[in-house]
Amino acid sequence: MQYMIIETFTHGAEPVYARFRERGRMAPEGLEYVSSVVTSDGRQCFQIMACEDRSLLDNWMAAWRDLVAFEVIPVISSAEAALRFATPGSLSGDS
């Protein structure tokens, strides 16, 4: 399962990146970092993480909660969404 993790840096970006430099991502085995982008003001990070066991994600977030507020949203790929939610003709503009 993939998750969109919206991270808000509660004390700014500097302490988050300082810890990252010192300790790395601190992700437990089985939790995969996929990709991320950061807002230009450095206040938030939008990360895609993947794991089969949600408790791995919870354990990872616990190590960062003193610096980061998290919102977790289960996500699927656009291709999977097109297959799952499309009705016949909806993608071609037919009604």
Which residues does each PLM region occupy?
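Conserved short beta-strand edge segments in small beta-sheet-based binding/regulatory domains
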Residues: 67-78
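A short, polar/proline- and glycine-enriched secondary-structure boundary/capping micro-motif
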Residues: 16, 58, 69-71
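Short, flexible helix/strand-to-coil boundary loops that buttress conserved ligand/catalytic motifs
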Residues: 61
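Short S/T/G/P-rich N-terminal loop/turn motif that feeds into the first structured element of a domain
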Residues: 1-34, 38-44, 52-56, 76-95
